[in-house]
Amino acid sequence: MTTLSFTVVHSRAEPHAAVPTIMLRLRVEEADGFSVHALALRCQIRIEPQRRRYSADEELRLYEMFGETTQWGDSLRPFLWTHVSTTVGKFDGSTEFDLPVECTYDFDVAGAKYLHGLADGDVPLLLLFSGTVFTRGDSGFAAEPLSWSLEASHKMPVAVWRGMMDLYYPNSGWIRVQRDTLDALQRFRAYRGLPTWDQAFEHLLKEAGEDGP
C-alpha cells in the first residue's frame, strides 16, 4: 500500500477565478516507492479558532459567534469551513499542486463571519484528506482509498483573505436578506430619494440612534 503525506506550502488569493477563490499550494509525497498514476482527492477544511490569540476589537466582532470571552473556553471550538475536491496527475516521489477554495462573503455562513472578524495575524486551518489513489505496478493498475487520518495544518495569513475579498468586492461587503425585507428596503430608499444603498443604511442607522460611518 502507498504511504502518502501532505503539507501546505503557501496560500494566495486567485485573481482570475469566476468567484472569490483562495488557492492553497499543496505538496504530496509517497514514501514507499510506488508510482502514483492519479489521485482523486477530497478535502474537508476546518478552522481551529482556539489556536490563535485575539485583540479586544476582534473579541467584540466575534461576540455573535462565541459569546463573552469568559465562555470561550467552551465555545471556541473547531468548525467546518468548506469541502473541496481536485485531481492530481501522475507523479513519482512527490509533486505540488493547487487546491482551489471557493469562498463566500455571506455573513450567515460561519466561516465568512469568523474571517471578517479578524484584523490581522493568521487563520489556523486543518485540512482532512480522503479520496482514492491509483497506482500502476507489474500486475497493472490498482486503486486504494485514502483515510481521514491524512491531514495537514496551515496558518493562512488574514491578509490573504482580505486581499482576496478586495479583489472581488473592493471596499464593500455582502449580506443576505429575505425578499420581502429587500422589497421594503427598496421602497424605503425610493420614497426618501436616496441614490445609493449606503445612504439608505446610513439613514436607517441615524433614525435608530446609531453612529454611521
Predicted features by range, described:
Residues R179-T196:
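Surface-exposed, Lys/Arg-rich phosphate-binding patches that contact polyanionic backbones
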Residues L60-T69, F134-W174:
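Short beta-strand elements
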Residues R61-H116:
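Extended, solvent-exposed segments with strong compositional bias
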Residues M1-M23:
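Low-complexity, acidic Ser/Thr/Pro/Gly-rich terminal tails and inter-domain linkers that flank the onset
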